[in-house]
Amino acid sequence: MAHPHLLAERISRLSSSLEKGLYERSHAIRLCLLAALSGESVFLLGPPGIAKSLIARRLKFAFQNARAFEYLMTRFSTPEEVFGPLSIQALKDEGRYERLTSGYLPEAEIVFLDEIWKAGPAILNTLLTAINERQFRNGAHVEKIPMRLLVAASNELPEADSSLEALYDRMLIRLWLDKVQDKANFRSMLTSQQDENDNPVPDALQVTDEEYERWQKEIGEITLPDHVFELIFMLRQQLDKLPDAPYVSDRRWKKAIRLLQASAFFSGRSAVAPVDLILLKDCLWYDAQSLNLIQQQIDVLMTGHAWQQQGMLTRLGAIVQRHLQLQQQQSDKTALTVIRLGGIFSRRQQYQLPVNVTASTLTLLLQKPLKLHDMEVVHISFERNALEQWLSKGGEIRGKLNGIGFAQKLNLEVDSAQHLVVRDVSLQGSTLALPGSSAEGLPGEIKQQLEELESDWRKQHALFSEQQKCLFIPGDWLGRIEASLQDVGAQIRQAQQC
């Protein structure tokens, strides 16, 4: 693939030209363009009058000298109206059953069929062959058809368990469209003077026949990396477990992979990336219920697994747990240990400070910070006499939080290991230690593991930053992925500061 970045830029400019004058239809235009460039079919679902036919007409201008055919199906439509009338001359002179296909579907590159589900069996059967094999049987001859894009539209879904399901399964991309929602866009649409049927695409951007044929071969050379396949298989396995998930045929999965290859190719990449998998949200649904379910499952895949977000959080959890174990071990070694006094028959156990603790004011460090009296506290200052009296007789004990202000009332106790423990309002405790006896900073083992984890996070974030330059993926999906990665990064940095 020569100059992939130039190709990606050209396709982006081509799409922008096709989108001119169409409001809130950028995603539909881009996916229809991707389908046309890879030879796939699209189904547009939505009420009348929302530019479904205009989208198909616009796609004709993506190609040089492309021919278009469009038809509104009714229950009374005949094959002659779609595939061309019979040649009376050929039948009369030579007895040949042959259609005159000029100006009809068999000779069109871009095809739009409205109210598709109203087509009769004779049309549907021929249409299936045209979609599957890009062939049309004309009398005794089988002719190749040049169709690059079939856009079918309706304001309803096909009935379940009907003869229409086979055709519905051939339509790889399925888009649910609605009226223009944004106020400014609605106003612009009402006041626009642009002729919707004008060609908005400069000649230099239009795709030639030679380019189209060459690209079809190059799309097939785009690789599917192992880690991307694992994500696809994970999604498939998850859908198989859900009772309400739609049935997805092997044929649909295979055709979807080619669409992902095309997305990578026209984004200037040589391999399918996790970001391309977002396109599956427009390929795997069947009805309104499954549309929401598919989007939810792909959202979980993208924000939890595609860039190892969940894996990194699992590693972080293990590191934090190990840090807590080391802190507990350190706490047991460095904590201030008071001396238990005799007095078996006294109502309250009595203690005293070690003989080597002689300062009139004691500053004791918390093994882990606590929030006390709305303040983040890392050390507490006690008057020696007040602390000795509390150890001997109990009652109220006060200390200066972080050594400042007035002495505040504290929830202090002596644990079974004869260590002083201060607790916050939620009864979370922190062991107290003398200055110099508490380890400072993170242990080397924990620091190294966190640095390695942060390095892996930076690699994943860099990969996403490179891959997100994809014309065919909506920005809101990219925003959610970025937020998920930033959340992981914030948790790693928070752990490094502990």
Curated annotation (Swiss-Prot):
It holds the Pfam family bpMoxR. It is an enzyme of class 3 (hydrolase). CDD domains: AAA. Gene3D superfamilies: 1.20.58.1510, 2.40.128.430, P-loop containing nucleotide triphosphate hydrolases. The keyword Transferase does not apply. ATPase activity is stimulated by ViaA. Its EC number is 3.6.1.-. Component of the RavA-ViaA chaperone complex, which may act on the membrane to optimize the function of some of the respiratory chains. RavA functions as an ATPase. PANTHER family: ATPASE RAVA. This is Regulatory ATPase RavA.
